[in-house]
């Protein structure tokens, strides 16, 4: 009976739902550090490890069939993709993030005057408490409070900040993007993750490995995840996109 109970317990955690404790302030005021959340694994399908050697830099897994995808506005639990290097996506099993989805595969993410805009409707999304503060406070005042204004720089000429960010396309499996000298840095880490080869420029031409490239078709879905406390959250605004395979489940 004890063995059967343990088997049922762990089967439910792997295939159906699991709980996680919130750590940090990045999801305030919606969720606070120390709160426990439950994650639905059935919705998008439970992620099953194909290899239990977690010392490897790349996750080997597959996902069981689910009945829904992650939608904009959903809260998700995900493994953090840049635990070992800011330049390369790697897997670390016990390093998990709780964030809100602000961009699903095929969406284009924009932040205007501190507010996230819904990819389809253009309306403001997420909890607006800290977005309002970001919109109204000066950069100098935010800097005094330790807020990092400068965001992910995929192109130095764009000068993105957490106040004004994008547009950034969120790749969807099967979609193709143009790869040029001015844009290759946007896709460098996702493409390295998918192919194992680096994008670089040589003699004015972009190469993937040893082959010139001008168009790339994505092999997987990607997500833009962010914290509701936009003044204190290490998320896609700073570090880039999250691969679908790293998402554990959707918060109930």
Which residues make up each language-model segment?
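Extended hydrophobic leader/signal-anchor segments used for secretion and membrane insertion
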Residues: 1-252
């Amino acid at each position: 009976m004890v063995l059967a109970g343990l088997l049922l317990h762990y089967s439910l955690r792997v295939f159906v739902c699991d709980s996680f404790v919130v750590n940090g302030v990045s999801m305030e005021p919606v969720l606070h550090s120390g709160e426990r959340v439950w994650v639905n694994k059935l919705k998008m399908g439970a992620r099953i490890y194909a290899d239990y050697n977690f010392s490897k830099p790349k996750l080997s897994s597959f996902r069981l069939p689910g009945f829904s995808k992650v939608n904009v506005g959903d809260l998700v639990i995900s493994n953090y993709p840049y635990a070992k290097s800011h330049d390369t996506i790697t897997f670390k099993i016990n390093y998990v993030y709780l964030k809100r989805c602000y961009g699903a595969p095929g969406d284009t993410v924009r932040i205007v005057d501190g507010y996230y805009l819904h990819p389809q409707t253009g309306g403001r999304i997420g909890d607006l408490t800290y977005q309002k503060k970001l919109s109204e406070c000066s950069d100098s005042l935010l800097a005094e409070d330790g807020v990092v204004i400068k965001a992910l720089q995929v192109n130095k000429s764009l000068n993105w900040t957490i106040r004004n960010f994008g547009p950034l396309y969120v790749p969807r499996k099967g979609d193709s993007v143009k790869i040029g000298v001015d844009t290759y840095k946007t896709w460098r880490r996702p493409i390295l993750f998918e192919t194992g080869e680096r994008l670089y420029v040589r003699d004015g031409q972009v190469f993937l490995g040893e082959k010139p490239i001008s168009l790339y078709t994505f092999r997987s879905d990607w997500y833009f995840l962010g914290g509701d406390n936009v003044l204190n959250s290490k998320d896609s605004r700073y570090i880039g996109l999250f691969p679908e395979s790293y998402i554990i489940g959707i918060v109930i």
